[in-house]
C-alpha cells in the first residue's frame, strides 16, 4: 500500500491543480513554492530572455495594455528580419522594475499606488517567480471590476547578466533594490546587485530624473551601495527630506516580505535613494 505523498509531490500536485483549473480568486500558498533563499547569479539557470528589448513579448504579461490588432497594423514598422515585427505592442512601456522581487510584496503594493505605470517584478528563483505570477493572476481576478493589478507582472530573470536585454536606454523611471543578498564574504562581493559595472547599466536603463531606491538591514551593504552609486557621475544621492516625502519609500519599508521580517525582529532599515542626472551635453 502506497504511503502518503511527500512534500515535494504535494507541492507539484498543488501547482498543477492551479495551472489546470479555472481562474481562481484564491491567493497561492507560499508553502507550495518553497526554494532556497538565494541563487547564484553566475550559474547557468537556463533562462529565457530576448535578444533585445524590441523582441520582448510584453503583451502577454500586460494584456490589458496591449494594442488592438488594428492599431498594431497601423503602426507596423518595416521588418528587420527578427521576430519583433510579429509581437503585439503595448500602449506604453514598462517603467518600474522591482529587481529581486522575492514573493512580490512590493510589486503588488506598488500597483494600486502607481496606477498609470507598468510595474515589473524580476526574480531569479523559478518557484518564487511562479508564486508571484499566480499571486498577480489571483489579484486580477479579485479586482476584475476595478481593473487593479493589470499593471503588474513578474518574470524570471537574472538582471546581473541580462538587464539591457529587457530595457532600452532611459526606459525606466524607478528601480527598487530591496534587501538584496549581502554576500558577506569578500570573495562574494562580486555577486552583489550593486557594483561599478552594474551602476553603469542602471544609468543606461534609468531616464534622467529617475530614481533608484535601495534598502537593506545590513549597514555594510548599505555603505557599499552608497559608495558605488556616489562614485558614478550620473547619480546623485537624494536628500533625506526629499527621500522621506516619497510615498514609495514608506511602501518599500513596510510591504516587502524581508522588510516585515526585519520589523518583527526590531532590526534596522538603511535607506538610500539616487537620482539619475542629465547626461552631459557632449
Curated annotation (Swiss-Prot):
A Gene Ontology term for the protein's cellular component: nucleus
CDD domains xref list: AdoMet_MTases
Chain residues that bind S-adenosyl-L-methionine: 100, 123-124, 158-159, 178, 256-258
First-tier enzyme category under EC: transferase
Active site: 181
Pathway this chain belongs to: tRNA modification; N(7)-methylguanine-tRNA biosynthesis
Gene3D superfamilies: Vaccinia Virus protein VP39
Region (Disordered): 1-36
Compositionally biased intervals (Basic and acidic residues): 10-29
Keywords: Methyltransferase, Nucleus, RNA-binding, S-adenosyl-L-methionine, Transferase, tRNA processing, tRNA-binding
InterPro entries: SAM-dependent_MTases_sf, Trm8_euk, tRNA_(Gua-N-7)_MeTrfase_Trmb
GO MF: tRNA (guanine(46)-N7)-methyltransferase activity; tRNA binding
Catalytic activity: guanosine(46) in tRNA + S-adenosyl-L-methionine = N(7)-methylguanosine(46) in tRNA + S-adenosyl-L-homocysteine
Cell compartment(s), UniProt: Nucleus
Catalytic activity, EC: 2.1.1.33
HAMAP family linked: tRNA_methyltr_TrmB_euk
Family: Belongs to the class I-like SAM-binding methyltransferase superfamily. TrmB family.
Function noted in UniProt: Catalyzes the formation of N(7)-methylguanine at position 46 (m7G46) in tRNA.
Binding partners and assembly: Forms a complex with trm82.
Listed name of the protein: tRNA (guanine-N(7)-)-methyltransferase
Species of the source: Botryotinia fuckeliana (strain B05.10) (Noble rot fungus)
UniProt lineage: Eukaryota, Fungi, Dikarya, Ascomycota, Pezizomycotina
Amino acid at each position: 500500500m502506497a504511503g502518503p505523498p511527500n512534500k515535494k509531490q504535494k507541492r507539484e500536485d498543488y501547482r498543477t491543480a492551479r495551472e489546470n483549473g479555472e481562474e481562481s480568486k484564491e491567493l497561492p500558498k507560499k508553502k507550495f513554492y518553497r526554494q532556497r533563499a538565494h541563487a547564484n547569479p553566475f550559474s547557468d539557470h537556463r533562462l529565457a530572455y530576448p535578444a533585445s528589448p524590441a523582441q520582448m513579448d510584453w503583451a502577454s504579461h500586460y494584456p490589458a495594455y496591449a494594442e488592438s490588432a488594428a492599431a498594431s497594423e497601423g503602426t507596423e514598422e518595416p521588418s528587420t528580419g527578427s521576430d519583433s515585427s510579429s509581437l503585439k505592442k503595448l500602449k506604453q512601456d514598462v517603467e518600474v522594475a522591482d529587481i529581486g522581487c522575492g514573493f512580490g510584496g512590493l510589486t503588488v503594493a506598488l500597483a494600486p499606488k502607481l496606477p498609470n505605470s507598468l510595474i515589473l517584478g524580476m526574480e531569479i528563483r523559478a518557484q518564487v517567480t511562479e508564486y508571484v505570477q499566480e499571486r498577480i493572476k489571483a489579484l486580477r481576478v479579485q479586482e476584475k471590476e476595478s481593473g487593479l493589478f493589470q499593471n503588474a507582472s513578474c518574470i524570471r530573470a537574472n538582471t546581473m547578466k541580462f538587464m539591457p536585454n529587457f530595457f532600452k536606454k532611459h526606459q525606466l523611471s524607478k528601480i527598487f533594490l530591496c534587501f538584496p543578498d549581502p554576500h558577506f564574504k569578500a570573495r562574494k562581493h562580486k555577486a552583489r546587485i550593486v557594483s561599478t559595472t552594474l551602476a553603469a547599466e542602471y544609468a543606461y536603463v534609468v531616464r534622467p530624473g529617475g530614481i533608484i531606491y535601495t534598502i537593506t538591514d545590513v549597514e555594510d551593504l548599505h555603505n557599499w551601495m552608497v559608495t558605488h552609486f556616489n562614485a558614478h557621475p550620473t547619480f546623485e544621492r537624494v536628500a533625506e527630506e526629499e527621500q522621506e516625502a516619497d510615498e514609495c519609500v514608506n511602501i518599500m519599508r513596510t510591504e516587502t516580505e524581508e522588510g516585515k521580517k526585519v520589523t518583527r525582529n526590531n532590526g534596522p532599515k538603511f535607506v538610500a535613494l539616487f537620482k539619475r542626472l542629465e547626461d552631459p551635453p557632449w
